[in-house]
Amino acid sequence: MATVRRQGRIRTSIGIVVAVLVAAACGSDSESVETSFVGDIRAAVDAVEAELGAGQEYFEVTAAPKLTNIFVAVDGATAAIPYVYADGELLPPAPALTGASGFTFTAEAIDVDDKAILTKVAEELPGATIQTLSVEGGEGGSVRYVVAAQSVGGGVLDITVGPDGSVLAVEPV
């Protein structure tokens, strides 16, 4: 499973972007599960498609409470154009990331229960602080949902979940 994940990620710069997202999301001390940002995944993809046209391919979409990062596959999935969606607005794209590789998906592949996905993680891993939800490209245009959370012990976990939030795998980062 870890091999597929590594293949589905853009190796250059994504780690930095995700680290910034995780750091930005760590400030919450709320006992309730913040799920409002899950809907930003669809809103961000819709905004990209309104800007570029329907049928775009994506490497990854990662939502956090403050913003959503979208990595649009271009040039035959050999490069990615990073966008940020924040406060209901798609910001201008960053420069292309060349040398990208991995699986891609289209908007139609995203099928997630916005209300349940993070709630189930919180129920199954009590005490973990949810930081981000990512939709990653999988084999054959499928998607994989990964929740990043800080464990009670302070470590960061990548939690692979089903569209309904059922925990499928937990990996320390």
Write out the residue ranges for each language-model feature.
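A short, surface-exposed beta-strand/turn
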Residues: 79-98, 155-173
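Bacterial N-terminal signal peptides that target proteins for export
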Residues: 3-14
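C-terminal motif of bacterial Sec signal peptides marking the signal peptidase cleavage site
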Residues: 22-25
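Cationic-aromatic interfacial patches
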Residues: 34-46, 173
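Bacterial signal peptide processing site
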Residues: 27-30
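Long, charged/polar, surface-exposed segments that mediate recognition or autoinhibition
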Residues: 87-132
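Exposed beta-strand-loop-beta-strand "reactive/processing" segments of non-cytosolic proteins
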Residues: 46-82, 135-160
